[in-house]
UniProtKB/Swiss-Prot annotation:
Subunit structure: Part of the 30S ribosomal subunit. Contacts proteins S5 and S12.
GO biological process, one term: translation
Protein name from the UniProt record: Small ribosomal subunit protein uS8
Native species: Bifidobacterium animalis subsp. lactis (strain AD011)
Superkingdom, taxonomy of origin: Bacteria
Entry similarity comment: Belongs to the universal ribosomal protein uS8 family.
């Protein structure tokens, strides 16, 4: 059976694994998911990620990051633009999750960027997710 929203599935796997204090989480691989993982690693929300060969296709293994006392790096993660209702924002109306404490992942013509990078470049796009 095909999955309706693989990005929401990825975000849910990350949220659930983080809440359950798992060290790693596996998910089906795609370039879009890899780009999201790159942003999460660059912003300090995950420790690392690798693409591994599976029985069928590839899987993306994400190593989660925790604080010195076991506190989660990803406190919350929310899918914004969905297949049934796409959400777009111009460069002058980009969201600032939690007043700038979180990040918004934006899909632009220049690839996936955070809202801060979009503001610097003056471009808008589709709001994929909020992470805080």
């Amino acid at each position: 059976m095909t999955m309706t929203d693989p990005i929401a599935d990825m975000l849910t796997r990350l949220r659930n694994a983080s809440a359950a204090k798992h060290e790693t989480v596996d998910m089906p691989y795609s370039k879009f998911k890899k780009n999201i993982a790159e942003i999460l690693k660059r912003e300090g929300y995950i420790a690392d990620f690798t693409a591994k060969e599976a029985r069928v296709g590839q899987t993306l293994e994400v190593t989660l990051k925790y604080g010195p006392h076991g506190e989660r790096s990803i406190q919350g993660i929310k899918r914004v633009s969905k297949p049934g209702l796409r959400r777009y924002a111009k460069s002058d109306a980009l969201p600032m999750p939690l007043g700038g404490l979180g990040i918004a992942i934006i899909s632009t013509s220049s690839g996936l960027l955070t809202q801060k990078e979009c503001l610097d470049r003056g471009i808008g796009g589709e709001i994929v997710a909020y992470v805080w």
